[in-house]
Amino acid sequence: MEFNPQKQLAGLLEWMDQQMTQCGGKTAVIGISGGKDSSTVAALAVAAYGRENVYGVLLPNGVQPDIDYSQALVEHLQIPHCTINIHDAVQGVLQEMEKAGLTPSRQTAVNLPSRVRMATLYAVAQTLPAGIVINTSNLSEDWVGYCTIYGDSAGAFSPLGMYTTEEVIALGRVLGLPEKFLVKAPSDGLTGLTDEDNLGFTYHAVNEYVRRGVCDPAIREQIDRKHRTSRFKFQTLPVYHNGLQIGRASCRERV
């Protein structure tokens, strides 16, 4: 089935409105990187809630060469926003680990900024009127687990969680976003490598596999392995069901 972004919009915006209502929220809080995902989510939020109810947060880690994209995006959408540099917070944690006799691994250094960003977004959300953090991940990233648990995978709900990277771009175009925000190559912000460099295959390959089942066998094996080993990132926190009662409901009904 051919993807029609215009037909998708009405249902998606209605769903976003329902999710915000269920959360008891008013202000959509979004981390702004200036790439296709955060730009498209921000544009969707403006369409769903009105720009006065969308708050963008720019979260550079020290000197960020592409921060101009983030600034240009919030100016284009004319949404309230702020900039909070997470460098000192990230370095503070790493330094305290060193003092405790712990040597941070490379993976720690890669994932910590994402978790600090999410903690900051929630701090901002709790400071604003009924602030709700909206997730900006897409299906392609999530399918291969290219996200940080309790970092960029977090949020109250995920508007793009069932859209591939190419479908996100199509949605962004229908929403009138300038092309520069949609074609900006995503990177981890630390190594200088793009997501696709780190993955070892393209998002297009993931998209073709997810939507059409078409994939080179060698790449399919890589995708399947990453998908299989990353499912824990998206599961509700497992709880041991001990059979004891909670009021009139069993513990099994807790989650």
Role assignments for model-derived ranges:
Residues 115, 119:
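Catalytic-core regions of hydrolytic enzymes
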Residues 38-42, 67-71:
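Short, surface-exposed alpha-helical segments at coil->helix boundaries
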Residues 91-92:
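Glycine/proline-rich, positively charged
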Residues 41-49:
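Conserved SAM-binding loop of SAM-dependent methyltransferases across substrates and taxa
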Residues 1-28, 52-55, 62, 71-86, ...:
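ATP/NTP-dependent adenylation/nucleotidyl-transfer catalytic domains that generate, transfer
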